[in-house]
Every structure is written in C-alpha cells, then in structure tokens.
Amino acid sequence: MAGNAVDNANHLTYFFGNITREEAEDYLVQGGMTDGLYLLRQSRNYLGGFALSVAHNRKAHHYTIERELNGTYAISGGRAHASPADLCHYHSQEPEGLVCLLKKPFNRPPGVQPKTGPFEDLKENLIREYVKQTWNLQGQALEQAIISQKPQLEKLIATTAHEKMPWFHGNISRDESEQTVLIGSKTNGKFLIRARDNNGSFALCLLHEGKVLHYRIDRDKTGKLSIPEGKKFDTLWQLVEHYSYKPDGLLRVLTVPCQKIGVQMGHPGSSNAHPVTWSPGGIISRIKSYSFPKPGHKKPPPPQGSRPESTVSFNPYEPTGGAWGPDRGLQREALPMDTEVYESPYADPEEIRPKEVYLDRKLLTLEDNELGSGNFGTVKKGYYQMKKVVKTVAVKILKNEANDPALKDELLAEANVMQQLDNPYIVRMIGICEAESWMLVMEMAAWGPLNKYLQQNRHIKDKNIIELVHQVSMGMKYLEESNFVHRDLAARNVLLVTQHYAKISDFGLSKALRADENYYKAQTHGKWPVKWYAPECINYFKFSSKSDVWSFGVLMWEAFSYGQKPYRGMKGSEVTAMLEKGERMGCPPGCPREMYDLMFLCWTYDVENRPGFAAVELRLRNYYYDVVN
C-alpha cells in the first residue's frame, strides 16, 4: 500500500515525498543540473509507486517506478528490485534504459522533510472512522481490527476515498450534473465527478467561461483511470490532485469542488462550519472535511437455516460479489471483521451475558457428524439459541462412558480459563452444558486446524501464512498482557475461521498467573508436547509467556513447513539433547529468511534474553505490512 511504501523510503536523504514534477525540476536546477544528478519522489499516479527524476544535458528526465504485485519495484520494461534504493543503486552502475548513469543524489536541504501526500494526511482518520462505522467496533476490538488488517484497509480506503470527497456526486445523470455545477458561483474551474455506469467509469464535469464541459474518465483492464489519451491514475483523488496543478489536456485546472446540494464544507461535527477556501495547486491537500454516514448497528445476523457464520467464501485478496457498482467502485473485500466470530456474541448490548457459565441444554442442538475427537471425547457442530440469534457453535463433549473425574476437572479448568478471555484471535467460550455428558460450547472455526489445512493446501502463499501467524501473535500478546500462559501452543491448536482468519484454541493446559507471578511451576511432568516446549519447561517445569514464545517459534516452523511435524523421527529425549548442544531446526524450504530469523530468536535458550510477545508481534506486523503492501 502507498503509505507503507513511502514510510520505507522516508529514510533516504534523496527522497522528497509527494512533490510535483515541476518541484523536482526546480530542485535539480538548484543542484546544478549536472549529468546524473537525481532525486526520488512519490508517484502521484500510482499507489505505492515512485518517480525518479534525473538531470542530463541540462534537462530533467522522469521515470515512473511501479510497485509490482510481488512487492518488487521496476521502471517499465526494466528489471525488478527489492526496493527503490536498490533500483537507484543498480542504475548507478548500469544505465539500462535511462539517459545516463545515476551519479550523484540531490539530498534534501537541512530541515526539509519528505512532503506528505494528500492520502497520508487523511488516511489514519479515514481508516479509523471506516472501521468504527462499518463494523460498529470500539475499544480493543477497533484497535485489533486496524492493526491486523491495516494493509487491506489502506487499499480499501485509498480506492474508495473519493466517496468521502465533496466533489464526488455518485450516480447522477449528465443533465443533473450540469444543473448542479451551474447553481451558485460560476467560478472557472468549478467541477464535480459523477459515476457513469456499472463498469467503473466516471465523468468529470468542468465549468469554463459559463459552459459545462464533460470529460469521460475510463477504467482500463488493469483498473487504472484516465481521461481519453491522458495520464493514468490508480484512484480518482490522485486524478483530481493532478488536474488541480495543471490542465494537461483539460481546458483549465480544477479549482473549486462543486458540493452536493445540502452539504456544508467545514470541519466534521461543526454546527457553524465555515466554508473552505479552494485554489489551484492541490485541492486534496486541503480537504479536511469529509462526512461519514451516521454510525449504525451491524446488519442483523441471518436467521437459522441461512448461510453458516463461518462461510468459506471470505477472501480478503479477492473481490466479493459484483465487480463494479455505480456508486462504489470495486466491491469491498471481505475481512475477519465480517465474520460472526470477530466480536464476542455478548458485544451486542441486547445479548445479556448470563451470570452463570452453565447453559440450558434445551437451547442447544447438536449435529450427528463429528468435527474431531481426542482423549477427552469428541467435538461436534451445534446451534445455540441466544436471546436474539441462533449461534453456530463447536461443542466439546466429554466421554460419557469413561466417567473419569480427572477429565471432568480438565474440562472445567479449561472453561474457567476461557470464560475470562475475549479477543478476536482467541476461540471464545459460550458456556458449559451438563446433560447426557459434560459439554464445552465454543465459537465455531469451520476450516479446522492450521496444520491440517496447510498440509492439504500447499498452494497457499507466504503472505497468507505470515498473515495467519501474525494474528496468532496478536492473540498471544493479549494472553501475555492478561497474565495467562497457554502451555500448548501449536499449529494443531490454531483453528481457521477462513483462509485469512485464525484463532487460538485448546486451553486445557493453560494457567492464569497471579499479578506477582511471571511463571507457573508444574508439580509433576505430565503428558506434555515436549517438542513444542522450551528448555526451562522440560528441565525445571517452569512455564511463562516466554516459554509460549518458544512454542510460537515451533508453530511458525510448522506453518512455513506446510503442517509438517517438528523434529520428525526424533524422540523427546533426542530433541532435548539437540537443544542443549545449541542446535535448532533448519529453515523450512522456501521460508523467507526474515521469518526464520524470528523463529531462531524465539528459540533463544536463555529465557531472560528471549523476546516477549509484544516484541514478536511488532516484528511480525512490520514484516507483514511490508510483504502485503
């Protein structure tokens, strides 16, 4: 996404940010216009792209650097590079399509920072408001949504931001647009944009000498927008920004946005809003007033018998439904927040959380087929009738014939932990039923365990795996902050709601730590998953969030190995001996080096030097943003 790519270039002394071509040329003139003098700037046409401005023979030459789908950067027809800096370094040795070698960077003058683009000015506020009002989220649920889905949200906001702009009038007719432009002031350059059809095309209506001119804005097969034979842009607001600086094929520059009838320009929430003064040279840069629809409740869940809550159709990398709408552009991509398990079922104020964790068996319906089984018994799909909705649930059913009090105690202990947890990346408990068997009723994650899913879907790309393990790190960071130790973190205990949404499950071994504790000491060695355990767990029976970090490193190895078993063919004692010698599992084939480095860091022998989940999540987050953008 544009924002992150720009953030990654801000450290370059020769990066000037969102300056115009003319401003770039002025800087090169200041530098003497010597052959090979160059600077880097943000592309004003392409999201996430850059432009290279080079002096040669006393003239400035400009090259667009586009960000490819795989995250690399290239000048059209040239070779791909990992970053704009790498591209510049390469062209300092090989001209390959440029007028000359890049010889000397023109650095920003002292005290000058890269110029912020119009979208960066609005982005953070737009994202926050969009998430608040689309999903009616608040507090931690809001923050978690923004952190985990920021790349997708940035792209979404960037491509739909025009809908918040005063100059966008949606699906009105040509006649209506003319009438609207002619109302009020007759300032030359007054303009609006309207949607033309369902194929994603628009029309620019521009007032010049009392007449309304119409320019068609077409969308090509790659999704780029342009007036006929004009420059191409990724978004409408980039197109408007460009033509507010120069006519470039229009009869004149865009000056004053024609507002929708009944819309007052000013600051949001201001009852006596003062009109904003508009002038050529960057309309978007001064747009600080945009109005969102009033917050509303989420659409009501479907009735019993309609689509399941964890539908398999969610995919944040592909559009859902029809491609283009008259008012919407590309349909919004589905995200974890669209599922019914992102928030607690009790987030709805009308769904009153019961004082007791025990549920009424008559309100629970079970399907016959098993989702899974284990030493404890079986897991079945079910439906629980809440006050307002029927909730699709997973039900862990204790073996009845065993009548083992220890199994019952384990189930109740797990329920005791789960009832205290509420996070989008942790499977929540709905309650317990005591009937023909003891039952633990939980949120449904229909796609099943992460390890099995990856074993069966080896086509899943790295960025999808990184997305999922980042979500797990967010859930574990929440556990760490809540003073809980999981003690059984493994890919088999991460369940998928969709291909792009993971939740941590199986809290049977989990322990709550007192405020004055930072570890739990087990009294005896149990049936432990030793291959996932840190040395201090095996040697001293000590468990902490730091030992969960070790397990998380093993989980990452499982994920990037597409569900392979760690330390395959080795006994627990052999694994322990291997770790004591300082040896670790090797990097899975094809795994990004940055991800293996993080695994290795998680496997730091000394618990004091091992990072906590706050550091692990942040490192994963930054890498995830980088590869997805």
UniProtKB/Swiss-Prot annotation:
Phosphoserine carried by residues: S43, S201, S270, S289, S291, S310, S313, S344, S373, S573
Protein name: Tyrosine-protein kinase SYK
Post-translational modification (record): Autophosphorylated. Phosphorylated on tyrosine residues by LYN following receptors engagement. Phosphorylation on Tyr-317 creates a binding site for CBL, an adapter protein that serves as a negative regulator of BCR-stimulated calcium ion signaling. Phosphorylation at Tyr-342 creates a binding site for VAV1. Phosphorylation on Tyr-342 and Tyr-346 enhances the phosphorylation and activation of phospholipase C-gamma and the early phase of calcium ion mobilization via a phosphoinositide 3-kinase-independent pathway. Phosphorylated on tyrosine residues in response to IL15.
Residues with the Phosphotyrosine modification: 27, 46, 130, 290, 317, 342, 346, 358, 478, 501, 519-520, 540, 623-625
BP terms from Gene Ontology: adaptive immune response; amyloid-beta clearance; angiogenesis; apoptotic signaling pathway; B cell differentiation; B cell receptor signaling pathway; beta selection; blood vessel morphogenesis
GO cellular component term of the entry, any: nucleus
Gene Ontology MF: a single term: protein domain specific binding
Organism listed in the record: Rattus norvegicus
Function: Non-receptor tyrosine kinase which mediates signal transduction downstream of a variety of transmembrane receptors including classical immunoreceptors like the B-cell receptor (BCR). Regulates several biological processes including innate and adaptive immunity, cell adhesion, osteoclast maturation, platelet activation and vascular development. Assembles into signaling complexes with activated receptors at the plasma membrane via interaction between its SH2 domains and the receptor tyrosine-phosphorylated ITAM domains.
Record text about domains: The SH2 domains mediate the interaction of SYK with the phosphorylated ITAM domains of transmembrane proteins. Some proteins like CLEC1B have a partial ITAM domain (also called hemITAM) containing a single YxxL motif. The interaction with SYK requires CLEC1B homodimerization.
